Amino acid sequence: ARKFLSTYGIPTVRTCTAESLADALSCANEIGYPIVLKIASPDIVFRQDVGGVFIGIDSDEALKAGYEKLMNRLAERQPGAVVRGVTIQKMIDVIDYELILGAKKDRQFGAAILFGMGGIGVEVFRDFSIGLPPLNQTLARLLMEETKVYQMLQGYRGKAPADLRQIEQIIVGFSNLIMDFPEIQAMDINPIAVSNGKAYALDARIILDRNEPAAGTAYPHLIITPYPTRYVSRWSLRDGTEVLLRPIKPEDEPLEHEMFTTLSAATLRERFYHPIKN
């Protein structure tokens, strides 16, 4: 999942998966202490529920003890789980805010994207909003503004404000990921940690749809068709001027307004069949 995130411009922290204690020690020394130790199992969705996460591990000795305790705890609490080792992740010292970004595909309605307060906050406070891909930065900001955590992200009780433009870009990148892969049934990034203004994806989960996407349709899993890039073309005028012809976008409104200000009253009247005052 983290490889997907990096490909779509969603920042993550240094992470590696280790199949043994020796591999875990090697990973930890390469990444650098302190680290977070997590169980790696496809059968465990919420690691905290089985005590599968240790934070603040700052030495080889602490890692050895944590590794042994983690394996014993898992054998006791979920003995049938398939264990693929552990995940070693560089620890972020101070987390100011936690966010969640998720998506789920409904067979009739299509894919929808969720944004809101992350960590345990998504279950306790249920502060989230829903949007439909594709999302641009304007729609991403509107998605953020519909949540209560948006006010906190602007600075709260001495905490640094989050880089809202970066979070917009993360949402847009996530939307592009969901658009490109109809095979994804559900996905969530939880939490997205905001530290000193910058956001990082700490954990991600992907569930694949076992059914084949509908044939003959470019985006069978979306209720809104993405921007038709196939109609974008470049042309040369007689004087050699290069022009770009493309379908209009919502964010073109300021440019359209600017164009209207250059037109005469007669041109506007012939275009709209009545005077345009504003």
Predicted region positions:
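ATP-dependent carboxylate/acyl-activation modules
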Residues: 1-275
